[in-house]
From Swiss-Prot:
Record key words, sorted: DNA-directed RNA polymerase, Nucleotidyltransferase, Transcription, Transferase
SMART domains found in the cross-reference section: RNA_pol_Rpb6 (SM01409)
Enzyme class: transferase
Organism: Chelativorans sp. (strain BNC1)
Keyword Transmembrane helix carried by entry: no
Gene name in the database record: rpoZ
Signal peptide extent: none
Domain of life: Bacteria
Entry keyword Nucleotidyltransferase: yes
HAMAP family: RNApol_bact_RpoZ
Name of the protein: DNA-directed RNA polymerase subunit omega
Subunit architecture: The RNAP catalytic core consists of 2 alpha, 1 beta, 1 beta' and 1 omega subunit. When a sigma factor is associated with the core the holoenzyme is formed, which can initiate transcription.
Length: 131
């Protein structure tokens, strides 16, 4: 496929705006180092993303889930409710003396100088030709 147009992808993702969101998210993933599923053919990341969608090497549903997950700031974890009564009954049986060590947890403290020295010691990431 020499040129990828929206018409090549519109039968995979019906809404053009959703297609733009998914393709741009995939292009960002490629820029961050994700493996591409097709030959690059000297194309830029947005074109590669559109070609992946058009060739159906990626599922639009999976891309949509990845996009939603990347935009979420707080992810709720569903925990089974059956475990809650057991935990509550164990807490009632546990004396307060056993709970005290949790309050004595100490966190490492770092001075500003140590923080700056650590930042200066960081190695910048390697340049990537995908841009």
């Amino acid at each position: 496929m020499a040129r990828v147009t929206v018409e090549d992808c519109i039968d995979k993702v019906e809404n053009r705006f959703d297609l733009v969101l998914l393709a741009s998210h995939r292009a960002r993933q490629i820029s961050q180092g994700e493996q591409i599923t097709i030959d690059r053919d000297n194309d830029k990341n947005p074109v590669v993303a559109l070609r992946e969608i058009a060739d159906e090497t990626l599922s639009p549903g999976d891309l949509k889930e990845a996009l939603i997950h990347s935009l979420q700031k707080h992810v709720e974890v569903d925990e089974p409710e059956a475990d809650l009564p057991q935990i509550a009954s164990q807490a009632e049986e546990t004396p307060d003396a056993e709970l005290a060590p949790e309050e004595n947890i100490a966190f490492d403290r770092m001075s500003e100088e140590e923080l700056l020295a650590g930042i200066e010691g960081l190695v910048p990431p390697e340049k990537n030709d995908d841009f």
